[in-house]
């Protein structure tokens, strides 16, 4: 399903923030990142160059993105970022694009919408995988700076570019398989690195739990449990389908 009605800056962030590699037999990497580029209608070419396809919404902007450096995804940091050169009719600019867990990136933005937490937690509660997007232009950076700059200096003072939301349906036989395991006296346990709200939704879908799940939410970077809060069900009036950016 194509991604439409997003700003050029969000499109550039989506096009740049990935770890896909082009080999002789095609693009290799995370299926969700491949899906994102396909939905955006951009394509990866040789030399880490990403351009809009002929039918892309941004084709008229005559832009291209060339990734110069990647800070790979880290499960501890919960994010990844890239430094890229963006070519436009007006000239060349240097773009930092960051993608990661919404709770982690929140402190890196210069400002966030008032409904930031409500929005991403609402999507997560419905079983979707949610990533926050951020960017900034650093036009004074030369080639030497690109190769030597520290990650901490890159991933700060970002502009919020939206949420990337993936709807990931269960495999057709998931519920049946887990029921068979439970019926044969096997205890089914979920271990996941996903958002707890997403995990709780999936656990209900596959019938690991059959009641409301209450989650103790400890703030990112907290050194004690004094700042913990209880996550309660949210009531939001929207539906999900495919990949969407909001």
Q: Would you name each region that the model predicts?
A:
Residues 176-179, 210-246:
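C-terminal cap/substrate-recognition subdomain and adjoining C-terminal extension
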Residues 1-160, 166, 179-208:
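Cytosolic catalytic regions of ATP/NTP-dependent phosphoryl-transfer enzymes
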């Amino acid at each position: 399903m194509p991604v439409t009605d997003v700003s050029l800056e969000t499109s550039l962030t989506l096009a740049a923030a990935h770890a896909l590699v082009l080999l002789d037999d095609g693009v290799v990497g995370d299926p969700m990142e491949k899906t994102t580029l396909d939905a955006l209608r951009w394509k990866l070419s040789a030399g880490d160059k990403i351009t809009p396809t002929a039918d892309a919404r941004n084709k008229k902007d005559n832009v291209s993105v060339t990734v110069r450096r990647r800070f790979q995804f880290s499960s501890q940091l919960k994010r990844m970022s890239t430094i890229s050169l963006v070519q436009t009719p007006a000239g060349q600019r240097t773009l930092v694009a960051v993608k990661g867990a919404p709770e982690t990136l929140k402190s890196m933005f210069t400002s966030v919408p008032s409904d930031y937490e409500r929005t991403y937690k609402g999507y997560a509660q419905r079983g979707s995988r949610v990533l926050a997007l951020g960017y900034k232009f650093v036009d004074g950076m030369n080639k030497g700076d690109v190769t030597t700059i520290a990650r901490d200096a890159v991933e700060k003072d970002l502009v919020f570019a939206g949420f990337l939301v993936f709807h990931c349906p269960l495999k057709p036989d998931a519920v049946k398989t887990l029921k068979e395991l439970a019926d044969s006296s096997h205890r089914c346990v979920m271990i996941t690195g996903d958002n707890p709200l997403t995990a709780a939704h999936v656990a209900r879908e596959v019938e690991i739990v059959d009641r409301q799940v209450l989650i103790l939410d400890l703030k990112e970077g907290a050194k004690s449990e004094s700042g913990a809060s209880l996550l309660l069900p949210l009531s939001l009036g929207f539906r999900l389908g495919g990949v969407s950016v909001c």
